[in-house]
């Protein structure tokens, strides 16, 4: 039920806090405080109020197909409750409660991969989907119109975070803002309040996880091999580290949403969901977002493979070699996962179908 989910949602926040503060530097401690302040503040100050309100209206917190709020709340009350959940589930990084995610990039790269690709952010959007499908109900969201405002806020988060990502020279910062954008795809899928949107959002949890963890682990491999953290410092490294940057290319193309990688299916379902909801402007937003994805990800690859090493950089690339075996092997496995998910996405789709019935 919703209360049990809330308890373990909070435990996840507390158990990952030491990982963010791991380095013990002033910057790491500041980032960890921001992480804890935003995630605990939103969950206790907003999400918990929403949960108590749901119980007062419905008399239960059990997850139920078709939801538990239909006929129990007015359309206006449903909109307010959804706002409390959308902003109270801070791990979904919906603007303006997104700043914990860039702050957490001070953590070691394996932790960043955990936070930004798999555990923490996915707990946020998973909770959003659970609340939308099993507390509100997709049909009730559509009939009440209570999620209409969320469509536009999520679209704003998608585009604005992508634009900010383009301005970041630090590789992990660029990937962090990319994550904020990609998470809002999932929230938007729910807000469309139809089966295709919810399926696309749910599938995007898996496709984004594989693509983004590949990118973060590649960033870690680059740092281990070169001690470089900025995009402007990567010129020519692709020819020295072809495996690492090859895996980065696969992850980037999957995030962009191009075949033959898994991200293409989830984005396609989201576009179909927007068409089904007669939201043509949202279809345009998806298209623009994919172009912005190209603009902030592919220049990293082009610099690495096609630019000459910058003479101002330390050692000018001399002495640098491919990342150690234990660094690049995991990136290759997750990159292959992006490919497998394209050809076998039907299995995931069949697994997810029951949530829309």
Regions found by a protein language model. Give the residues of each.
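Short, aromatic-rich membrane-interface segments at the entry and exit
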Residues: 4-7, 350-351
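Hydrophobic transmembrane alpha-helices and their helix-loop junctions in integral membrane proteins
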Residues: 2-5, 14-304
